[in-house]
Structure formats: C-alpha cells, structure tokens
From Swiss-Prot:
UniProt xrefs under NCBIfam families: elast_bind_EbpS
Elastin-binding, as annotated region: 14-34
Protein name, as recorded: Elastin-binding protein EbpS
Entry keyword annotation includes Mitochondrion: no
Topological domains annotated Extracellular: 2-204, 341-486
Positions of transmembrane segments: 205-225, 320-340
Bias-annotated ranges (Basic and acidic residues): 1-40, 103-118, 126-160, 180-199, 247-259, 299-314, 361-398
Location relative to the cell: Cell membrane
Cited CDD domains: LysM
Domain of life: Bacteria
Bias type Polar residues, positions: 64-85
InterPro entries: LysM_dom, LysM_dom_sf
Length: 486
C-alpha cells in the first residue's frame, strides 16, 4: 500500500473504460444519436465520472428488473383470473374473450420495449444525468397505472359481453327452479364446475330441445293460462329460493344433484312437448295439466329438500353437540383432578406447617435447656475461679508476710551491723583525733596535695593513711571539711 493518500485517491478516480465493458459501450454509442438531449462533447471530454456512478447504475438495474418481474407476475395472475371467469359454454363467447384477453400482452409490448431501451442507455444517461432515480420511479408508476387501466377496460368489456349474450334456453315454469339452482351452484361451488360441466351440459341440451318444442307447440294455450302460470311461477320462485338455501352448505351433494336435475329436465321437457302438442286442439282446461305435473314434481323436490334440511340439521346439531359434550367432560375431569391436587397440596402444607411448628418448639425448648446448662456451668466455673483466686491470694499474702518478716529480720540485722560499724568507726576516729592534727580544706586542695604538705611526698601510702584516718573511700573532699592527719 502506498504511503501517499493523494496517489491512491487519484488512482481510484480513473476513467471506467475496461475491456469487460467494451460491448456495452458500443451499444451505448449506437443509441446516443437517438437521444436529442445528450451532450456528446461533454461525454468524450469527461475523464473522471462522478463518484458512486456504478453503484447507482446497479441500483437502477436491480429496481427495473424487480419491477419487470413483479409486473409480469401480476399480468399472468390477472390473465388467469380473467380466463377462469370468462369460460362460457358458447364457443363464440370464448373466442371473443380469448381475442380480447390477448390485447393486454400486445399493448404491454411498447412499455417493455421502452424499458429495454432505457436499460441499454442507462450507462450513457449516467454521465449527463447523474441522478435519474426519481424520474425512473415516476416512469414506472405511470406505466403501472396505464396497464391497470387497460386491464380494467378489457375485463369490463368481457363482463359486458357476457351479460349481453343470449340465454341458452327459455326460463319457463317447468325449468325455472333448475336454472336458478344451477346458477346458484355455479356461483357458490366454483371448484366442482369443471368436473360436472360436460355431463350437465349434455343432459341440459336434451331438456332445452324438448322444452323449446313444447313452448313452440303451446304458444296458443299460453294466453289462456297466463294468470295461473303467473301464480305457479311465483310458487316455483319461492321453492327455488328454498332449494338454493339448502344447497349452499353441501358441496359434495351438488354433483349428484346436477346429474339428477339433468335427467329430470329431460323428462319434464319431453312431457311438456307432448302436452303442448295436444294443447293446440284442446280447451283451456287441458292446458293446465303440465302445470299440475310441474307443481307435483316441484313439491316432490321441496319435500326432498326439506328431508335433506332435516338430516343436515340433525347431523349439524350432532356435530356441534359432540365436541361440546367432549369439551365439558374434559373440563370437568380437569377440574376434579385440579381440585384433588389443590386439596392434597393444602393438606400437605398444613401438615408441613404443624411439623415445622413442633420442630420449632422442640428446638426452642432444647435451646432453653442448653442455655440453662450453660448458665449453670458458667456460674460453677465462676465460683470455682473465685475460690481459686481467693486461695491464691491467701497464699500470696502469706508468702508476702513471710518475706516481709524475713526482710525485717534482715534489715534489723543489717541495722545492728551498721550500728556496730559506726561505733567502731567512731571509736577509731576518736582515737585518731587524740593523736593527730586537723586540716581544713580550702580552695582546690585534694588528698595528694594535703599529703605533700604534711608528709613531704604525695605517695599512695600517705594518701591511704589520710583516707583511713578520716574514713574516706575516695578522693572526693569539699571546702571547709576538717581532715585528720595521722
């Protein structure tokens, strides 16, 4: 690593024109002519790109790729929903819906091409526009809004065409309950539609053909029995509503019910055709027979639906009551076990408390006994110590008295000896005073000078004579002292 910070800084600021980016730069140079707001002179003269340009470019590329993936996923999901909602028995409606569902993909080609064009020229736009992140976000939001509006218009168009398509058969009094039931089953049970569609459509076609022939033959008799038919239609509508309410909660029974209704529709259509053919030549009273048969069949359906409702209610009540009973039993068992556990715990705690109190009482009594024993032992030890001290004191006093007596005797003997010695010294002094001279010490005289003065020489023998005569032990004498000179 170099020690010069400026060299490293300038080295990191060199132009980014490596061999790995040559292909990308060639594509950028080809597309630069199409950008009118690009300043080519500044790009060629610029040697040092702005700092963090590669980081911003990678960030923009990741954002655009992520937005494209999210947009494609949302587009495919919307197409799948539209295709599932737009499936109709008529081939003409399917073809028209498929052509319209293909239009968003064609319309989305232009914004995708614009995104590819923008990704190609992103590196060139970095040099002239160092901060295009906000414009890119605005561009993405505008494109998403346009795509959403296009998809909404296409879906609205398809729903309008579906609503304008003609009905595949007439809603007569004979098959009105079946048609309402089929519509309700198609809306509530979506997952079983594809399985039972082919079988149901075949049976429905037979019913439609027979019903159409019957209606064409009985056109003359419709005016006579219009009022009666209106009342029958109202009754059929109420019956169909009841059957719809019964078929909402059973998905598994819808398949068998559609199969049964298909066969029933075929039979009703055939009967209607026969009755309508004879109604052209008979009176108005004869025209009411198919309605009677229709009412009988509808009453039979209502009875079946009522039985199914009873069975469903019984089964539903059993399904609801069984978990409740089980839950109550489990909760009761848990409550019993919990109460027993709490009771045992409380009994155990009481016994533990009693045992603890007894133990504490025993410990307290034991402590009291030990304290009493300790106090007794202490008193005994103190008494023995006192007696021992008294004995020691008495013995000590006796020994002191003996010693004092001995000392007194010794002192008395010493005094006697001292007295005798003093008497002897006094006698000797008296003897010396009777046969010698007296000298009074003056000034700085000492025994040596006194011996020279009286004996003519200061020999040790002369000095010792003077000492012995005066009872002196040393050479110390004082002024004014009288000394006997032998």
């Amino acid at each position: 690593m170099s020690n010069n910070f400026k060299d490293d800084f300038e080295k990191n600021r060199q132009s980014i024109d490596t061999n790995s980016h040559q292909d990308h730069t060639e594509d950028v140079e080809k597309d630069q002519s199409e950008l009118e707001h690009q300043d080519t002179i500044e790009n060629t003269e610029q040697q040092f790109p702005p700092r963090n340009a590669q980081r911003r470019k990678r960030r923009r590329d990741l954002a655009t790729n992520h937005n494209k993936q999210v947009h494609n996923e949302s587009q495919t999901s919307e197409d799948n929903v539209q295709n599932e909602a737009g499936t109709i028995d008529d081939r003409q409606v399917e073809s028209s819906h498929s052509t319209e569902s293909q239009e968003p993909s064609h319309q989305d080609s232009t914004p995708q091409h614009e995104e590819e064009y923008y990704n190609k020229n992103a590196f060139a736009m970095d040099k002239s526009h160092p901060e295009p992140i906000e414009d890119n976000d605005k561009h993405e939001t505008i494109k998403e809004a346009e795509n959403n509006t296009e998809h909404s218009t296409v879906s609205d168009k398809s729903e309008a065409e579906q609503s304008q398509q003609p009905k595949p058969y007439f809603a007569t009094g004979a098959n009105q309950a079946n048609t309402s039931k089929d519509k309700h089953d198609d809306v509530t049970v979506k997952q079983d539609k594809d399985e039972s569609k082919d079988h149901h459509s075949g049976k429905k076609g037979a019913a439609i053909g027979a019903g159409t022939a019957g209606v064409a033959g009985a056109a003359g008799a419709m005016g006579v029995s219009k009022a009666k038919k209106h009342s029958n239609d109202a009754q059929n509508k109420s019956n169909s509503d009841k059957s719809n309410n019964s078929t909402e909660d059973k998905v598994s029974q819808d398949k068998s019910k559609d199969h049964h209704n298909g066969k029933k529709g075929a039979a009703i259509g055939a009967g209607t055709a026969g009755l309508a053919g004879g109604a052209a030549s008979k009176s108005a009273s004869a025209a009411s027979k198919p309605h009677a048969s229709n009412n009988a069949s509808q009453n039979h359906d209502e009875h079946d639906n009522h039985d199914r409702d009873k069975e469903r209610k019984k089964g539903g009540m059993a399904k609801v009551l069984l978990p409740l009973i089980a839950a109550v039993l489990i909760i009761g068992a848990l409550a019993i076990f919990g109460g027993m556990a709490l009771n045992n715990h409380n009994n155990g705690t009481k016994e533990n408390k009693i045992a603890n109190t007894n133990k504490n009482n025993a410990d307290e009594s034991k402590d009291k006994d030990t304290s009493k024993d300790a106090s007794k032992d202490k008193s005994k030890s103190t008494d023995s110590d006192k007696s021992k001290e008294d004995q020691d004191k008495a013995t000590k006093d006796e020994s002191d008295n003996d010693q004092n007596n001995a000392n007194q005797a010794n002192n008395q003997a010493q005094n006697n000896q001292n007295q005798q010695q003093a008497n002897q010294n006094q006698q000797q002094q008296q003897q010396r005073q009777g046969g010698g001279q007296r000298h009074t010490v003056n000034g700085q005289e000492n025994l040596y000078r006194i011996a020279i003065q009286y004996y003519g020489s200061g020999s040790p023998e002369n000095v010792e004579k003077i000492r012995r005569a005066n009872g002196l032990s040393g050479n110390n004498i004082r002024n004014g002292q009288q000394i006997v000179i032998p």
